[in-house]
Curated annotation (Swiss-Prot):
Family recorded in the similarity comment: Belongs to the AccA family.
Pfam families: ACCA
Disulfide bond sites: none
Catalytic activity: N(6)-carboxybiotinyl-L-lysyl-[protein] + acetyl-CoA = N(6)-biotinyl-L-lysyl-[protein] + malonyl-CoA
GO MF, any single term: acetyl-CoA carboxylase activity
Residue ranges occupied by any CoA carboxyltransferase C-terminal domain in the UniProt entry: 1-236
UniProt name for this protein: Acetyl-coenzyme A carboxylase carboxyl transferase subunit alpha
Keywords: ATP-binding, Cytoplasm, Fatty acid biosynthesis, Fatty acid metabolism, Lipid biosynthesis, Lipid metabolism, Nucleotide-binding, Transferase
Cellular-component GO terms for this entry: acetyl-CoA carboxylase complex
Statement: the UniProt record of this protein carries the keyword Lipid biosynthesis: yes
EC number(s) per entry: 2.1.3.15
Organism name: Streptococcus thermophilus (strain ATCC BAA-250 / LMG 18311)
InterPro entries documented for this protein: Acetyl_CoA_COase_a_su, ClpP/crotonase-like_dom_sf, COA_CT_C
Gene Ontology biological process terms, A to Z: fatty acid biosynthetic process; malonyl-CoA biosynthetic process
Length: 256
């Protein structure tokens, strides 16, 4: 098995810590909030408010399940438009009250079903991209498993984008890439090599800003490493004026 194939397998492993795990372990007194106030709550997206070193922070994440029933409830981590609208509601609330935003991303992509399209999946993702680019509080996005397509990017227009070591971030799945390019989804490992989807490759290209080492999925070291990094980064970002914060975010994505 190639290194890319190993990372792809580990990124998709059901045993990985989830967005909710990170929210509860890193932030004190985390309170989950629900609903987009338009249609319904989406179990694939979690969000709420917690405290980090006494500072209130808004946390949003894409949640995969840990077993079959949980995955059915979470739609296998594929958000509907109401999930992205819930995320945006919480981020705009954070802006109103001056809270920083931290997002945790693990999704193969936004849900492509008929109902999701009818309710404006494309519009919901596009609106998140637009609103996050101008959100007047610090944003940190962390890829904790799969970072698939616009479904991941809809929570990743951030001042800093980080990845755990054994995760991926890509425009679509390697299987989808192979199917489009060669009409053969079984060539996904070959596609993954071409796509440059691993954390090390993306760090070298300047697409992500930090790679957090992993020593297994379940260790407290990962929690502590992420917590320390978030505390340090938010302290730096909070020193910037709103104008400088937004300009730096704009330039970060403009360079692509």
């Amino acid at each position: 098995m190639s290194d890319v194939a190993r990372i792809l397998k580990e990124a998709r492993d059901q045993g990985r810590l989830t967005a909710l795990d990170f929210a509860k372990e890193i932030f004190d007194d985390f309170i989950e909030l629900h609903g987009d106030r338009n249609f319904r709550d989406d179990g694939a997206v979690i969000g709420g408010i917690g405290r980090l070193n006494g500072q209130a922070v808004t946390v949003v994440g894409i949640q995969k399940g840990k077993n079959l029933q949980d995955n059915l409830n979470r739609n296998f981590g594929q958000p509907h438009p109401e999930g992205y609208r819930k995320a945006l509601r919480l981020m705009k609330q954070a802006e109103k009250f001056g809270r920083s935003v931290v997002t945790f991303i693990n999704t193969a992509g936004a849900y492509p079903g008929v109902g999701a399209e009818e309710r404006g999946q494309g519009e919901a993702i596009a609106r998140n991209l637009m609103e996050m680019s101008d959100l007047k509080v610090p944003i940190i996005a962390i890829i904790i498993g799969e970072g698939g397509s616009g479904g991941a990017l809809a929570l990743a227009v951030a001042d800093k984008v980080w990845m755990l070591e054994n995760t991926i971030y890509s425009i679509l799945s390697p299987e989808g890439f192979a199917t489009i390019l060669w009409k053969d989804g079984s060539r996904s490992e070959e596609a993954a090599e071409l796509m440059k989807i691993t954390s090390g490759e993306l760090l070298n290209m300047g697409i992500v800003d930090k790679v957090i080492p992993e020593r297994g999925y379940f260790t407290s070291e990962i929690i502590e490493a992420i917590k320390t990094a978030i505390v340090d980064e938010l302290a730096e970002l909070s020193q910037l004026s709103t104008e400088d914060l937004l300009e730096a975010r704009y330039q970060r994505f403009r360079k692509y």
